[in-house]
From Swiss-Prot:
One Gene Ontology MF term: aspartate-tRNA ligase activity
The name this protein goes by in its record: Aspartate--tRNA ligase
Source organism, top-level taxon: Bacteria
Record key words, sorted: Aminoacyl-tRNA synthetase, ATP-binding, Cytoplasm, Ligase, Nucleotide-binding, Protein biosynthesis
Region (Aspartate): 198-201
Localization per Swiss-Prot or TrEMBL: Cytoplasm
Ligase listed as a keyword: yes
Pfam entry (one): GAD
Gene behind the chain: aspS
NCBIfam families for the chain: aspS_bact, PRK00476.1
Length: 588
């Protein structure tokens, strides 16, 4: 139906006859001449219709051109010629196609929005097929496609084996809720959609496949936000006979090569490394954005004897923290703006936010200064590095809570004050805690997942020091986004059973849920480790968008709906009966 793509018609084709196909981007009837911007996936070319006196064919072509509306689908035949008025804004701006025939392949109904408009997100998702025609959306989807293609080429060339793992599998606790699928042939029993291929890829290592990868679809029934979806795509990888640095060095080289190939970005020749403890202490986050130079400063030692009870209590608590954040030039903040910062911190658990301003002349303005002697407060500000014109925020409370809300303030201040440097800041975060204590459940939970190996090999040591145990987990972070997470796995059945026990998973429960894994580890499992990268998140970073929905062809809303297909939707009683499911009426 076509000999060339619209966006690739150029000066080398001048004088030649071409056949094009695409959508009517714009049609302009100027009376004696019609101009059509014809668009396909490669871009736009101008089609010109000039009726010649006494020429029945050109008159018919003009009549067709004059009838066109937005997004009509056309086939155009014509001769390429140089444009009198060059359009430098498009790739084909030096040429035009003089139409000798126009065939309307399909008429478009009146549009809810035009390809060059940017309506509300619900409208975009309802008419996703129209939204995806927009050049910006085409660009972002192509970025994702190029990313996946480049990853496959890179791994295939290095002897990784692309192996599929089951989509219908066993429900296992991996953090979020499972999506459950009723098993028609086994009444009352259910499959689960995989949250990740974690256990299968470990078993593939036991099976001797050495290097595995998969572009895997994963499913988690969790609350949605800009960087989360119910179903998502990850690059899943696993290596046999490796230590942490073996995995990290390989994938660091891979990510560096992929960014260069896909978006022509040169990442650092060596990614910095930082322990989890250092990241939390300096940045209040386990995924710090190193483009922002601001850092948290611990001040507990300086406030232990202060008369401000909030500070003194946290400073004298072994699990407490008092931290300060200096914002250069922040003394310009109004009281309302400071209240906005306090409200932002409250979203992350802050019960209050203290501050101190230093005017350009060095005058201190702070509601907490009265709890300190003049010299003591001056020493506190000096320890933080405060200078004239700055504001210093203080947070006090439990260590993790203070780290969370002060880290959130750091990000907000960095953006508000234009302190986010241009470029890319990758790093590795390592040495995560093995466990964290769940106050509500009154038990330990795994910080990564229960198959992550501890840094110690001795089970008695792990049991005795579970509270402070460090894992062999690692995350790759880019511009404040966790783009990949992995670990060295537990390959000994006795260690895996011990970790289950520390997590409150008894032997009987472990056998019921993970018996197949424990059995596999008993038959000569090699030391192994791996990592998984979020394809959606990396594609969004490459495409320059804050929402992964922009790089997913058919995403769900934050309300977990597909507005285009109207999913989820009720199921007929007959279908429910076939899978032995009965739906309880909603409670009034």
């Amino acid at each position: 139906m076509r000999t060339h793509f619209c966006g690739l018609v150029d000066e080398t084709l001048i004088g030649q006859t071409v056949t094009l196909a695409g959508w009517t981007d714009v049609a302009r009837n100027l009376g004696g001449v019609c101009f059509i911007d014809l668009r396909d996936h490669e871009g736009i070319v101008q089609v010109t219709v000039e009726p010649a006196e006494g020429d029945a064919n050109s008159a018919e072509v003009f009549k067709v051109a004059a009838s066109l509306g937005y997004e009509d689908v056309l086939q155009v035949e014509g001769v390429v010629r140089a444009r009198h008025a060059v359009n430098d804004k498009i790739r084909t701006g030096k040429v035009e196609v003089i139409a000798t025939r126009i065939t309307i392949l399909n008429k478009a109904a009146p549009l809810p929005f035009h390809a060059h408009e940017n309506p509300g997100e619900d409208t975009r998702l309802k008419y996703r097929y129209l939204d995806l025609r927009r050049p910006e959306m085409q660009r972002m989807q192509r970025t994702r496609i190029k990313l996946v293609q480049a990853l496959r080429r890179h791994l295939d060339a290095r002897d990784f084996q692309d192996i599929e793992t089951p989509i219908l599998t066993k429900a296992t606790p991996e953090g979020a809720r499972d999506f459950l699928v009723p098993a028609r042939m086994h009444p009352g029993e259910f499959y689960a959609l995989p949250q990740s291929p974690q256990l299968f890829k470990q078993i593939l290592m036991v099976a001797g496949f050495d290097r595995y990868y998969q572009i895997a679809r994963c499913f988690r029934d969790e609350a949605l936000r800009a960087d989360r979806q119910l179903e998502f795509t990850q690059l899943d990888m696993e290596f046999a006979f490796v230590r942490e640095r073996d995995v990290q060095d390989f994938v660091e080289d891979m990510i560096r090569a992929i960014f260069k190939e896909v978006v022509d970005v040169e990442l650092a020749a060596q990614f910095p490394r930082m322990t989890w403890a250092e990241a939390m202490r300096r940045y209040g986050s386990d995924k710090p954005d190193l483009r922002i130079a601001l850092e948290l400063v611990d001040v507990a030692e300086l406030v232990k004897t202060s008369e401000f009870p909030v500070f003194a209590a946290a400073a004298n608590d072994a699990d407490g923290r008092v931290a300060a954040l200096r914002i250069p030039g922040g003394a310009t903040l109004s009281r309302k703006q400071i209240d906005d910062y306090a409200a932002h911190a409250a979203k992350y658990g802050a019960k209050g936010l203290a501050y101190s301003k230093l005017s350009e002349t060095g005058e201190v303005s702070s509601p907490i200064a009265k709890f300190f002697g003049e010299e003591a407060f001056a020493a506190l500000l000096a320890h933080v590095g405060a200078a004239n014109g700055d504001i210093v925020f203080f947070g006090a409370g439990s260590y993790n809570k203070v780290s969370d809300f002060m880290g959130a303030l750091r990000l907000k201040a960095g953006k508000d004050f234009g302190l986010v440097a241009a470029g890319w800041a990758p790093l590795w975060v390592t040495d995560f805690p093995m466990f964290e204590w769940d106050e509500e459940a009154q038990r330990y939970v795994a910080l990564h997942h229960p198959f992550t190996a501890p840094a110690v090999d001795d089970i008695a040591d792990l049991r005795a020091n579970a509270r402070t145990a460090v894992s062999r987990g690692y995350d790759m972070v880019l511009n404040g986004n966790e783009i990949g997470g992995g670990s060295i796995r537990i390959h000994r059945p006795d260690m895996q059973s011990a970790v289950f026990e520390l997590l409150g998973i008894g032997a009987e429960e472990a056998r019921a849920k993970f018996g197949f894994l424990l059995d596999a580890l008993n038959y000569g499992a090699p030391p192994h480790g791996g990592i998984a990268f979020g394809i959606d998140r990396i594609a969004a970073l490459m495409a320059g968008t804050e929402s992964i929905r922009d790089v997913i062809p058919f995403p769900k809303t934050t309300g977990a709906q597909d507005l285009m297909t109207d999913a989820p939707s009720p199921i007929a009683a007959e279908q429910l009966a076939e899978v032995h499911v009965q739906v309880r009426p909603k409670q009034a």
